[in-house]
Amino acid sequence: MTYSKNVFVPVTNICRNRCGYCGFRREPGQPGARLMKPEEILPVLENGAKAGCTEALFTFGEYAEEVSEYRKWLKKLGYSSTLEYLLFLCEASIDIGILPHTNAGIMTRTELKALKPLNASMGLMLESTATLDAHKDCPGKLPELRLNTIREAGKLQIPYTTGLLIGIGEIREDRIESLEAIAGLHREYGHIQEVIIQNFAPKPGTPMENFPAPSIEEIIDTICLARQILPSDIAVQVAPNLIDPKALIAKGVTDLGGISPLTIDWINPEAEWPDIKELQRKLSPILLKERLPIYPQYVRKKWYSDRIGGLIEQLSDTDGYRKKP
């Protein structure tokens, strides 16, 4: 059972999408709306490196530049685009000794190509191939746009994370279709390292706050479907702060994602990360094994640039897992 140790950096929560279930997004002027400054981010990265974290998870609202106030904030920091700022943050992270993993919504091939040399892996939740009410005000949640980003990442040989969000109005057939779409892209490009099966958790103050959470039976069924449909070299992941993983391991879960000893889950701030030692005790006799944000098979295949190669080699053992510090 693998996991990575990360720091979670929510660079901005300004977003052009208005998902019915999202508690992360803010409008400029709302309490908590922000674009994090370098002086806020760099200490998080430095503390993460000291704590033995290997992954900097950079998250963004999607195409925040469509919001004029955000563009002003960015200009004030001295950057002309989100991409330019993100490239700076990735460079800083590498220099500090933490591997970047960027999740910033849909991206063009040009953006992916610019970020590839500075990221150990990247990610985008597919969520669902279905057209859902939850996404009615979300230009970036059109399934074909998301699948295209995942496809372009494959063409560029970027180790990639994607996943399904369960319980947002989709039906079982939609989940099957979503898993088949991911499997098809992986068979073509070989770049999907993990698929997250994430359970929807209702957030107060959102349009879907009274929507029922999916049952454990639905989650188990989806994990079983994932294991049947996805190629065997793709890890199936659940978040241990959102669901108890113990009963799910027998169904095919092989990874617990990024767990942070320092930062909260900014997307699900009500859900605390488990303590890694406590998690190991609960999961015994199954052993937890730490990995990097790039999975061992991609470390061994050297799917990374020279810019991050030295750091990956420094942090990984001969099998491509995290070297014991």
Curated annotation (Swiss-Prot):
GO molecular function, one term: 4 iron, 4 sulfur cluster binding
Domain Radical SAM core span(s) in chain numbering: 1-241
PROSITE patterns attached to this UniProt entry: RADICAL_SAM
Family: Belongs to the radical SAM superfamily. CofG family.
Keywords: 4Fe-4S, Iron, Iron-sulfur, Lyase, Metal-binding, S-adenosyl-L-methionine
Enzyme class: lyase
Binding positions ([4Fe-4S] cluster): C15, C19, C22
Catalytic activity, reaction form: 5-amino-5-(4-hydroxybenzyl)-6-(D-ribitylimino)-5,6-dihydrouracil + S-adenosyl-L-methionine = 7,8-didemethyl-8-hydroxy-5-deazariboflavin + 5'-deoxyadenosine + L-methionine + NH4(+) + H(+)
PANTHER family given in the database record: 7,8-DIDEMETHYL-8-HYDROXY-5-DEAZARIBOFLAVIN SYNTHASE, FO SYNTHASE (COFH)
Name of the protein this chain belongs to: 7,8-didemethyl-8-hydroxy-5-deazariboflavin synthase
